[in-house]
Design a protein with these regions (language model features):
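Conserved active-site-proximal phosphate/metal-binding subdomains
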Residues: 2-129
C-alpha cells in the first residue's frame, strides 16, 4: 500500500506502472541487487533472463553493475520506463489509485471499527444477549 501514496518516493510513472500491472506481471529476479527480489517484468529483467547472457552477480557486486541505471530511472522516469527497477509484490494487481497517506490510515481505521463491530455482534449473538 505504501508504494501507492502521494508521499512515497516513487515516481508518478512508477506508480502508474503498478496500477496497470497484474500479479502475473511480476518476476523474481536478482538482476538489480544480486539478491532475489520480486519486481515488475520489463526489458531489463527479460534481458538478464535471456539465454547466453551472464548470470547476475551476488550482492553487493550486482548493484555495482546496476546502481547507476537505477539512479537514472529515478532521474528520468519517462524515458526509462522499459528498464526501471519497480520492486513490488504480487499484491500489485490490487493497486487502483494513488492516495494520500492520511486517507489510507482513515480507511484502515474505519475498516477496523466495522470489523470489531461485526465481531461484537457475533459474540453477543453467540452469548444469547
Amino acid at each position: 500500500q505504501w508504494l501507492m501514496v502521494e508521499e512515497a518516493e516513487n515516481t508518478p510513472v512508477q506508480q502508474q506502472a503498478y496500477i496497470e500491472a497484474g500479479s502475473r506481471d511480476t518476476v523474481r529476479s536478482r538482476s538489480f541487487t544480486g539478491k532475489p527480489c520480486r519486481m515488475l517484468k520489463n526489458d531489463w529483467t527479460e534481458a538478464w533472463q535471456t539465454e547466453g547472457n551472464p548470470e547476475p552477480l551476488g550482492m553487493p557486486l550486482q548493484y555495482m553493475v546496476s546502481g547507476m541505471a537505477v539512479s537514472a530511472t529515478h532521474r528520468w522516469p519517462d524515458q526509462t520506463v522499459d528498464v526501471a527497477f519497480n520492486p513490488v509484490g504480487q499484491v500489485v494487481g490490487q493497486f487502483e489509485k494513488v492516495e494520500k497517506t492520511g486517507a489510507v490510515i482513515e480507511r484502515w481505521v474505519n475498516e477496523y471499527l466495522e470489523a470489531t463491530e461485526h465481531l461484537d455482534q457475533l459474540n453477543e449473538a453467540a452469548a444469547g444477549v
